[in-house]
């Protein structure tokens, strides 16, 4: 219950950054996978997404690369965030995201998904002096007006790197069905 209270406090703080002119700030979150009226509730930015990402504590686990996140429900509809720190980084001015041992927190508004996320694609663009990155997990919480609070933990425990196994710059986790027949990878 205390964790939910903290998440709601973070969500209120993130939504308080909307300019007084009534315009939404520029955002890096968008609909993915051909989201339609049945898969996404409205096209306004009414839901609040809070994302916790734990970087591994092993040697050279941190990265300077750009990290993107896609989330989808079992029906394949969802959202994609192209630059997590720019979209909703909450760690403060000058914080180095995705560094060894960090628990980085991001929160921002986005279109509401009709169903909770159960599929995730985490990707690195491989740029920067230290492109390799070891991610322990991604935890996502989604809530919105007249909606419950959906929470999903995606265990990653994988390098996103071209020089370490599995030699991929992305990790896909599909928890949509027990038989592994959930959302197809992008």
Task: Map each language-model feature to its residues.
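Regulatory, non-catalytic segments
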Residues: 2-186
């Amino acid at each position: 219950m205390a964790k939910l209270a903290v998440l709601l406090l973070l969500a209120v703080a993130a939504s308080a950054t909307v300019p007084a002119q009534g315009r939404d700030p520029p955002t890096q979150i968008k609909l993915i996978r051909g989201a339609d009226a049945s898969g996404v509730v409205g096209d306004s930015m009414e839901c609040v997404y809070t994302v916790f990402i734990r970087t591994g504590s092993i040697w050279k686990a941190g990265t300077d690369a750009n990290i993107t996140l896609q989330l989808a429900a079992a029906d394949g509809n969802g959202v994609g965030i192209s630059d997590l720190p720019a979209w909703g980084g909450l760690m403060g001015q000058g914080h180095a995201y995705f560094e060894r041992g960090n628990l980085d927190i991001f929160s921002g508004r986005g279109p509401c998904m009709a169903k909770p996320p159960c599929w995730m694609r985490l990707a690195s663009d491989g740029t920067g002096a230290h492109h390799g990155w070891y991610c322990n997990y991604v935890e996502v919480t989604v809530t919105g007006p007249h909606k419950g609070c959906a929470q999903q933990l995606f265990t990653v425990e994988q390098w996103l790197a071209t020089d370490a196994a599995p030699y991929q710059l992305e990790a896909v986790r599909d928890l949509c069905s027990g038989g592994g027949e959930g959302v197809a990878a992008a």
